From Swiss-Prot:
The active site is at 32 (nucleophile), 35 (nucleophile). SUPFAM superfamilies: Thioredoxin-like. The keyword Heme does not apply. This is Thioredoxin. It comes from the Eukaryota. The gene is TXN. The modification N6-acetyllysine is found at residues 3, 39, 94.
């Protein structure tokens, strides 16, 4: 299941609640074509990797979160463990997304 993040507070709470689990964050926008293309795949990964937390941040709804995380383009995927960023890449690359999850989990 993918949790939609609505605020900076909710983002911080989700990172804190994850504990030792890997957190994958999809920074996207409704108007972004590549974001729409990879969204179903991102959701399918959340079903496949039940031990990983999947979050979705709409950069237009949560500009403060996107800015704090220094997101420059969409989609950007960031990976967190124990509240610290441990990985990041931009672009709708399905293979890289799953490979990065496998590497960090």
């Amino acid at each position: 299941m993918v949790k939609q993040i609505e605020s900076k507070t909710a983002f911080q709470e989700a990172l804190d609640a994850a504990g030792d689990k890997l957190v994958v964050v999809d920074f996207s926008a409704t108007w972004c074509g590549p974001c729409k293309m990879i969204k179903p795949f991102f959701h399918s990964l959340s079903e496949k990797y039940s031990n990983v937390i999947f979050l979705e941040v709409d950069v237009d709804d949560c500009q403060d979160v996107a800015s704090e995380c220094e997101v420059k383009c969409m989609p950007t995927f960031q990976f967190f463990k124990k509240g610290q960023k441990v990985g990041e890449f931009s672009g709708a690359n399905k293979e890289k997304l799953e490979a990065t999850i496998n590497e960090l989990v």
